[in-house]
UniProtKB/Swiss-Prot annotation:
It comes from Mus musculus. Belongs to the adaptor complexes large subunit family. This is AP-3 complex subunit delta-1. It comes from the Eukaryota. Residues 639-651, 665-675, 791-836, 847-862, 894-916 have a biased composition (Basic and acidic residues). One of its GO terms (cellular component) is presynapse. The gene is Ap3d1. Residues 773-790 have a biased composition (Acidic residues).
Amino acid sequence: MALKMVKGSIDRMFDKNLQDLVRGIRNHKEDEAKYISQCIDEIKQELKQDNIAVKANAVCKLTYLQMLGYDISWAAFNIIEVMSASKFTFKRVGYLAASQCFHEGTDVIMLTTNQIRKDLSSPSQYDTGVALTGLSCFVTPDLARDLANDIMTLMSHTKPYIRKKAVLIMYKVFLKYPESLRPAFPRLKEKLEDPDPGVQSAAVNVICELARRNPKNYLSLAPLFFKLMTSSTNNWVLIKIIKLFGALTPLEPRLGKKLIEPLTNLIHSTSAMSLLYECVNTVIAVLISLSSGMPNHSASIQLCVQKLRILIEDSDQNLKYLGLLAMSKILKTHPKSVQSHKDLILQCLDDKDESIRLRALDLLYGMVSKKNLMEIVKKLMTHVDKAEGTTYRDELLTKIIDICSQSNYQHITNFEWYISILVELTRLEGTRHGHLIAAQMLDVAIRVKAIRKFAVSQMSSLLDSAHLVASSTQRNGICEVLYAAAWICGEFSEHLQGPQQTLEAMLRPKVTTLPGHIQAVYVQNVVKLYASILQQKEQAADTEAAQEVTQLLVERLPQFVQSADLEVQERASCILQLVKHVQKLQAKGVPVAEEVSALFAGELNPVAPKAQKKVPVPEGLDLDAWINEPPSDSESEDEKPKAIFHEEEPRHTRRRQPEEDEEELARRREARKQEQANNPFYIKSSPSPQKRYQDAPGVEHIPVVQIDLSVPLKVPGMPMSDQYVKLEEQRRHRQRLEKDKKRKKKEKGKRRHSSLPTESDEDIAPAQRVDIITEEMPENALPSDEDDKDPNDPYRALDIDLDKPLADSEKLPVQKHRNAEAVKSPEKEGVLGVEKKSKKPKKKEKKTKEREREKKDKKGEDLDFWLSTTPPPAAAPIPAPSTEELAASTITSPKDECEVLKGEEEDHVDHDQERKSSRHKKKKHRKEKEKEERPRDKKKAKKKQVAPLENGAAAEEEEEPIPPMSSYCLLAESPYIKVTYDIQASLQKDSQVTVSIILENQSSSFLKNMELNVLDSLNTKMTRPEGSSVHDGVPVPFQLPPGVSNEAQFVFTIQSIVMAQKLKGTLSFIAKDDEGATHEKLDFRLHFSCSSYLITTPCYSDAFAKLLESGDLSMNSIKVDGISMSFQNLLAKICFYHHFSVVERVDSCASMYSRSIQGHHVCLLVKKGESSVSVDGKCSDATLLSSLLEEMKTTLAQC
């Protein structure tokens, strides 16, 4: 045996190791493949040996070869053998090889389960660590399911090294086996408070990655992460947590208010640019979520913008890019804050880095207004001239057009200037966006009627100088503008000054060098122009001139008939025959102008891009059904036919045909093509104009065109945009002077508030009367399609509610030995019973301490409690999370409400109540015994003896169902709009209430420019935007299409809440329909009841009794007769409409409690008689109590 070992050791001395393999590959550069194949043969021999060291050496060399691209899957079994080695150095080699080449398709991977489980339970931390590292690379759903419990156990390992790796690999396990997330989550959550910073950061990383895709499931962890954020000094952990808060804030706006202060402190204090950027990013997300109806945080916005300016001015290009990226997010909600830094953004356009220039361009898009549009476009036009490289120049061109055309051209005040800009852009050579300029020319000419005359004159000039533009004839080149020019001159030919000249320009022989689709448009619009000229000549009784025009067409059209493009041929042939027919009729003296013009009667309006998609499918039409059943076998077709419109996924499965060899298919294809080429009767396929239009060549395929500098680049007769800029400035100056004169007349004798009045966008009137035609849609158009989520997304399965209690079926599978049940002897049972009894007092003490500790922990981790910043009153009931969510559209029953309150207060129950519950159990047991002995006819009498119910616990007997209730009341209604409202109070703000208003469009008109104004009283004032006067309204931040409703929130400041009050208000809006737009107003009275200032606050009977005994409360009472509603439903109505909670109920008597936003305590005792209800109330303010009881009387009278 010893000799054998010695011999094996000597043999290994002569084996090639990894260093020898690498050295050999370097020495055999000429025949590397041959050398490696020899080495692989040697390795195969080494793997057949029994010595594990030799095998490990062979696997090590195979791992290197795998990195060079060689397949080593054939050695998978040998790799598993090395993984199972007892020596760590060999085991590590095996796991490295497995992590390199094992995947879900590896057959032998199932053999690794027991080996990995054995290594995970190894006493050596290094064996466990290497197993965890390797498993993370090749984990499969089966491995994840089988090993999840073992890995979860390692999360509580004594060594931080193992805990950290176990926490990290759980993320991979969750992805492969999502069912393990819920059972493992409590332990993962514990690791957030691990004493080791490495384990803690690993847990933060895993949870942040999970929350990035499904943030709503991790909202309950916000208090814990907030604690980490304020205590951690690790920048990496802080960045992760701050990014997570950025995702959670839109889901819980209250969280944003809590985050503002610590985040701004971090922004001020941190020197790390990465942390600064993430803080700014999250503050932006917070402010976006708080922007609706809440007060401004202008200081925070200004701070963010200042810090981002520092980033943008930094010499580091990465920081500059990130600063511009974050600035674009602020721009969406606070554009004015960013617009003041326009100079800095424009400087970035001169940056060497193209990505920064492009990001600055994106920012300019949002910074544009009516005032600065011309200035920004002028700056961009100078960059177009200086731009190097077609890619950036094309991007500039696209951005100029996007900036001008955004929101239906709302920033353009002078469309003549815009047409001149588009014409100037036609001078660009080598651009790929000629079709974009052409599309804009067409769009503006069609939509803006006032500009058509000017547009036609410019397009005719463009057609006259077509030889300059047509020099670049590649697809999507600048010659595409001739497409638009020809169409506009033909469609709106009545505006042409010299139609004859334009017609001759369109019939020049050089036109035949243009692409086919442009020639086709030329031919089509030549006949439109011809019809217009014919009508003019006939009206002037100039028959000779009309015949000359006809003769011109007869002579020039044959050049188009001979075109290689089929569409041009077809159109030219049809029109030529039409013109020849007209010529015959002219020879006979028959007037034909009206009939020819009738061919082109009517206007062409733009069609919405998705109009075809939105056409509703008729009833009974199945678009997926076969029109003709497919043949069973298709032998003639070798290739799959191409989709006509887009790449379609096969929806119907067909019988699989046997796969044919690729070489055989290629050979057949070549033979068929050769046969077609030799066949004189076969028409060769050429790409259609539409297809060629779609397949635009890339930048690399654009041919380089030499510019003849002897030809002037400026098109004669074309206007310069600078002239229009000056004219526009003069026009605006005159407009300002006229307004100043009017203002001076009005303000005569009044004090002037501002010496230099600023000009807003709305003050700038357009140069022309703009009537923009909207896009046409089909009848009964369907709503826009939403892209379905990717069905292969691995994160979809991890969208799991983690707050729901764990069911038995969700526990992780654990391998167990089947044990036979041991039969317990009565003697042993007796001994165990004595032991249990003796341990009871100690257990009770432990349970009490644990419960107190859990109370504190739960209190800190409860999201609602944490977000509530109001401290509890000293001798008052303990305030819990606000249950104001009862103001939903319906309520199920007081039973449910009380259970909610009970659940929220469970954390505050002390062990005194346990004794109560034990006594209750004894009573219950005694009652059950008596129940068996009593006769059945006494059951009804027994049911009436109900024990007192605390904190709103519902009665045991079944009551009638509660009708649905809504907290929203009708505010006002007109044929156009219906307005309902609800007033919501909050404990956190003692002088503010939020009025939620739902606006529903009841008409067929489009409602826009909505504005709500409520007249302030001495007591109640509406919160308005900064700079607004008392008489200004608050704009509603949305528009209402027909049949749509939306909700807006408005904040009111209240001084005294003891009296109800009504405020007058007006809702003004513009109703736009096909006939035009009308300005409408709707008056209303906003009723602030005293109940709207109350907040549902749970209270225990002990605290309630102390409050009543204090003697500080005033008393009042009411009685209402004619009540037919059940007591349960009555309590539900009081709870819902007046925001009370049930403290205790006995039979037909209940004590109730509520609290106002200014801290007034309101206690009620509600008693129901046969047909009447009496309510005794006590409150810290007598006026508030009498007002509340009056409101309650009105509610009870309806019962």
